[in-house]
């Protein structure tokens, strides 16, 4: 497969500030990824605050409480804005790489009692089908080598390091836990090794789209 290429960019005003949106595309498959860039990030010796955020239509756009994705997206952009410089790679691997319709099929199995890993396996997929190596290529195309990575996922860190990206710090991103996703977060911690911190008061649930507060389940 040919390497991904940087193909276009434009200004993108957001509630977190004026970002540049940079488009990337594989020349053979036309599969697309994007990055949101704030400030000067290219070819500097200073580590850049960055987030690899995998696409989640239900969490990012439809305000789902079944995961923490939408909360992580907003929190990452807010932290980058506060820092005044940084990058968010929007990694277009919906449903941990199984696609939107299969993710809904997995949700249906979860409604019947399976956890997020069991549901993927029952559908014939691995627990995580995502390819993070492309994100290392995107960092390189953006002129970024040293990264402070906003993540709870050790696999992202390992993949970036193996690809030659210097991860100088892991920045925790524990936000959005609620009664609908606490078991999901537990599963990611126990079965996937994610660094999950439950029910921290410094990370209160922010749910401006809910008609009432969604209480955090007590442990």
Swiss-Prot record:
GTP binds at residues 51-55, 72, 94-96, 116, 151, 156. It holds the Pfam family GTP_cyclohydro2. One of its GO terms (biological process) is riboflavin biosynthetic process. GO terms for cellular component: cytosol. Its EC number is 3.5.4.25. Pathway: Cofactor biosynthesis; riboflavin biosynthesis; 5-amino-6-(D-ribitylamino)uracil from GTP: step 1/4. It comes from the Bacteria. The active site is at residues 128, 130. It catalyses: GTP + 4 H2O = 2,5-diamino-6-hydroxy-4-(5-phosphoribosylamino)-pyrimidine + formate + 2 phosphate + 3 H(+). Zn(2+) binds at residues 56, 67, 69. SUPFAM superfamilies: RibA-like. The keyword GTP-binding applies. It is an enzyme of class 3 (hydrolase). Keywords: GTP-binding, Hydrolase, Metal-binding, Nucleotide-binding, Riboflavin biosynthesis, Zinc. Its cofactor is Zn(2+). GO terms for molecular function: GTP binding; GTP cyclohydrolase II activity; zinc ion binding. The keyword Zinc applies. Binds 1 zinc ion per subunit. HAMAP family: RibA (MF_00179). Catalyzes the conversion of GTP to 2,5-diamino-6-ribosylamino-4(3H)-pyrimidinone 5'-phosphate (DARP), formate and pyrophosphate. Belongs to the GTP cyclohydrolase II family. This is GTP cyclohydrolase-2. The gene is ribA.
